[in-house]
């Protein structure tokens, strides 16, 4: 599809109608959803009349070039005010009195854009596991259509972290410096590493292993919550560091309030030693209630015995060494600690996540990440792709990031000619790009003052709309749950 300075206005969809089939839209306030007529995906699949969600702040100037495109991370939404709120506001990095700020929701996300929750017109049901593979480049091309419909002539700066950084890199590589003037990429990579691909696979396998997954054809109200929760816990560990968790949690027990946040199930007091052991063993198991499990211990034990063949009898002389018994009174048992604050935190995060995300969407977006490679279908040598990026670029890395390592940021800065590299010294790992607000704000403001001088020096426009949250407020969509608030 060709692009013009002013493309045909896109049809705006009624969000209330879409909410009937996608209740997760209730979590995003103030966004708009438009219908894109057509897009041919990289795979060759043709999309017709599909939705893209976005949210804006500020006003487009007369030249239609004061545009900041903010790209969200893996499970984020178009609501920048929620997950990067401390950067949004007058005289901040994302200043709506100077810039027209827009964040477009990536395809595969459950928050408004084309996703497994979208209704397939041909079947009248959700796409579910039949949702087509959408790449980072597909996102950029779909988002460009929306920008054209809004009259955007060029982008002053594209900014994103993690998956959002992948989109930022593709924006610059796909459209050049005539359209994209500057770039800021945080905690990202030129191509998705084997390490990251492996973590994505482990998280998908968590979902697949849930018996409620049903090949992806599960009812939305009965999605595989145990698998999705486990996937989220696994992901969170990659966003932090060993020292971050040790400093906060150590081996402490969770408080009553923390246990309530984690929705730790109340279990009945065990009446036998076996029930006591079973409750410890299955603590955290989400597929059955602990009380019910304890009540069937004898039955389960009997079923194991009854399936043993006579030749392997538990009473035979050859197997006597493997036979034992457990005795004692429950009141006399004093077990070692088995429930820790770190576990409580992970369970809380898992429970919080399943109430705001969809399992098929999680699978779709992690596969999107796996496709990311700036050199794919361009040239074999990725350094040549990076060397062709002409835009002034700010690369921000995190010294303790174990997912998108600092060496990967150094690689970007080494081969992108007009780039500067900044390091965030933080013990918080990958999530620091969503936590170190003051430093990130300072770095971006300084970069924009240098490279978007005309816009930054222009008289600010009056902007009385909503702005971001301060850093003490809890984010709904952010990758980071401020661990210090736990």
Swiss-Prot record:
Keywords: Acyltransferase, Amino-acid biosynthesis, Methionine biosynthesis, Transferase. Coiled coil: none annotated. Residues 250-262 have a biased composition (Polar residues). The active site is at 162, 162 (nucleophile), 401, 430. InterPro entries: AB_hydrolase_1, AB_hydrolase_fold, HAT_MetX-like. Its EC number is 2.3.1.31. Residues 248-274 are annotated as: Disordered. The keyword Acyltransferase applies. GO terms for molecular function: homoserine O-acetyltransferase activity. Pathway: Amino-acid biosynthesis; L-methionine biosynthesis via de novo pathway; O-acetyl-L-homoserine from L-homoserine: step 1/1. HAMAP family: MetX_acyltransf. Commits homoserine to the methionine biosynthesis pathway by catalyzing its O-acetylation. Belongs to the AB hydrolase superfamily. MetX family. This is Homoserine O-acetyltransferase. It comes from Saccharomyces pastorianus (Lager yeast). The lineage of its organism: Eukaryota, Fungi, Dikarya, Ascomycota, Saccharomycotina. The gene is MET2.
